[in-house]
């Protein structure tokens, strides 16, 4: 059991560290956002097709028509999420875009309450309030940015839109229980290829090896390999540990943004980032619920 937990922890850590470098590869590629997402889907689809074939997930009859359509719908949301998140990096910075993106658990809670009738506890509302205060701190710091204030605010709005689309995708995927997650991911990126092919800039393909290397890495490593590591870890780890290790992602992204691009967060931004990540961790780990049960019992 210890070996399983150790392996799962290593897989989850590796997956989150890989995720933390996505923004760097997006910006280094030097390509328009739609082209970056398109090529990520192309190379990711090729990688996941190979992985699904090796795992035996391509056999006929594995998917019903409803399951397939839901997976396609989740793919539309995931691809839109990538477009908005990647667009936020050049406007609000990788660190801020990633931090704001981490409000997604709260959006998922809100959507579940709206569409599934799930109740929102006082504890979750408290964490939501803290995350909102963090957002206010980040937004109020727009004057400190070297870029125009409007671009900074647009970057935050794009990251929020990305988080909302991810929450929609997660809500749809909840209905795909029992479907191999690698196959869901394959359908999602194939959906992205079909959606973005008409918008891809075929007349101005990347001209440098750096651009192609970045796009290949985003497709093969950040999509194919990362999904295998992530889903492997989720199968081995308890939910609480999975949630805790997931915060390696934003921390890694903040460090990459600082080391690679010299983007240093101001005091208000640090306060906002810390508040959002603390609130997300508190809600995912259920902090406060145990105390409340003790008091009421």
Region spans (language model):
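Transmembrane alpha-helices of multi-pass small-molecule transport proteins
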Residues: 31-80, 107-108, 165-169, 185-203, ...
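Specific transmembrane alpha-helical segments of multi-pass solute transporters/efflux pumps
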Residues: 55-95, 101, 137, 219-237
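Helix-helix packing/entry segments at the starts of transmembrane helices
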Residues: 9-10, 97-103, 172-191, 223-259
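Hydrophobic transmembrane alpha-helices of multi-pass small-molecule transport proteins
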Residues: 48, 52, 72, 111, ...
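Hydrophobic/aromatic residues within transmembrane alpha-helices
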Residues: 29, 36, 40, 88, ...
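Glycine-/small-residue-enriched transmembrane alpha-helix faces in small-molecule transporters
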Residues: 1-38, 73-76, 84, 146-175, ...
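Juxtamembrane helix-entry segments on the extracytoplasmic side of multipass membrane proteins
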Residues: 4-8, 30-38, 62-68, 140-165, ...
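Specific alpha-helical transmembrane segments that line the substrate/conduction pathway
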Residues: 35, 42-46, 86-119, 239-258
């Amino acid at each position: 059991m210890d070996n399983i937990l150790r392996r799962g922890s290593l897989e989850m850590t590796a997956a989150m560290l890989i995720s933390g470098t996505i923004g760097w590869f997006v910006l280094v590629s030097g390509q328009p956002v739609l082209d970056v997402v398109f090529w990520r889907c192309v190379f990711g689809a090729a990688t996941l097709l190979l992985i699904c074939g090796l795992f035996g997930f391509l056999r006929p009859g594995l998917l019903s028509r409803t399951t397939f359509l839901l997976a396609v719908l989740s793919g539309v949301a995931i691809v839109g999420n990538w477009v908005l998140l990647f667009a936020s990096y050049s406007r609000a910075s990788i660190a801020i875009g990633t931090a704001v993106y981490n409000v997604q658990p709260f959006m998922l809670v809100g959507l579940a309450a709206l569409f599934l009738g799930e109740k929102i506890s006082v504890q979750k509302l408290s964490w939501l309030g803290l995350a909102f205060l963090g957002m206010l701190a980040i937004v109020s710091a727009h004057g400190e940015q070297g870029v125009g204030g409007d671009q900074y605010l647009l970057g935050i709005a794009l990251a929020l839109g990305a988080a909302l689309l991810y929450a929609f995708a997660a809500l749809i995927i909840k209905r795909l229980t029992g479907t191999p997650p690698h196959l869901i991911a394959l359908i999602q990126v194939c959906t992205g290829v079909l959606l973005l092919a008409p918008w891809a800039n075929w007349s101005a393909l990347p001209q440098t090896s750096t651009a192609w290397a970045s796009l290949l890495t985003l497709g093969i490593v950040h999509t194919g390999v990362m999904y295998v590591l992530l889903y492997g870890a989720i199968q081995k780890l308890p939910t609480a540990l999975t949630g805790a290790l997931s915060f390696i992602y934003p921390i890694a992204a903040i460090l990459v943004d600082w080391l690679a691009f010299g983007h240093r967060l101001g005091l208000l931004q640090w306060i906002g980032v810390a508040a959002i990540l603390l609130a997300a961790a508190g809600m995912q780990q259920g902090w406060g619920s145990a105390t409340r049960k003790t008091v009421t019992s």
